[in-house]
Every structure is written in structure tokens, then in C-alpha cells.
């Protein structure tokens, strides 16, 4: 009985601290465009553009946990409380370029796009780049207010599409988009047939086959 009581007490704080997606976010995506610039000895990060798009297709559980370490991290905090409400890791082409000899004598800039869930209230976003020893090379923190008139709204006009495989729950599935690049409008029937064949090929293999 003592062991069970102790276990219940130990588990209580974890349950109390469990984060609910709907407490801080709405079902939309905030796209943040950054510019990474610099060379082997000096780097900088700048915000380029903010966009909001319909629906959020990323994680809704374990929002503040990192899946893998990566060479960089994006951290979202609730501005009012300072609580971490979303984190993710990444590795970029810019960081890969910094490991090349060219970066010792040249300065370049790279465009980078990050997606986070759209917040209900003002957030503080911190982006940091790390070296191979996980030491922070450069970092940027900036605020995002959902009411900011400079945030562009995109993707609200419907784009023609056809569903090949309907998920039972669209919030807990992998979304695959087949893009008709290289096909003319008259070749849409051919494209759809090719897409269906590609889709069937995917579901012929595990783990997709048994989870279809």
C-alpha cells in the first residue's frame, strides 16, 4: 500500500503539469521565415516574414520536449508567464555550409522556414544555432503577437485537390501531398492515375500496410 501511495504522489505533479494544446494554441500554423547569415567566425539571425496558415499538422502532445538534439532549437514561451509551451530541433544547410572551408573566407545568407502552432496570446520565440559540441553560436529572441497586422494570412483560398486516402482522424496521421509538377491541365487524369499507383506502392509496405 505504501508503494502504491508513493507512486500516486510521484505521478501527481506530472499529471498536473501536463500541457493541453488548446490552452495556448489555435488550430492554425504560424510560419516564421528567417535569414541565417555569416561565416565561420560570426553568424546572425534575422526575422524576414510572418505568415499564418489554416490548420496545424504538427505535434499536439509533448509540446515542450525535443524529439532529437539537432544543431539548433526553436523555443516558444508564453510571454505573460515565461512558460515553455513549444520546442523543436533542427539542422540546416547554413550550419552544414559553416563546416566547409569556403565559410572561412566568404559570407553567405540562407533562407530558413520554421512552423510552430499559432498562439492565442503573445509569445517569445527564441532561435539558437549550435556547433557540433552543442554550444550556442548565435541566438535571437523576438516577440510575436497574434494581433500583429504585419502577419500575412495565406492558404485561405481553397486549392483544387482530390483525396486518394481518407484518414479516420486527420489530426493523427501522416499527410502526403502529390504535386502535379510537370503535368499539363489536360494531363490531370494521367497525373491522378500515377498518384494512385504511387499511393498503393506506399501502402504495400509496412508499417503503412497494417495501419491503412
Stretches found by the model and what they are:
Residues 1-20:
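Bacterial Sec-dependent N-terminal signal peptides
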Residues 17-22, 122-123, 158-163:
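Short N-terminal helix-initiation segments at or just after the protein's N-terminus
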Residues 18, 88-90, 191, 199:
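Composition- and surface-driven signal marking solvent-exposed, interaction-prone regions
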Residues 149-209:
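Fold-level signature of zinc-dependent metallopeptidase catalytic domains
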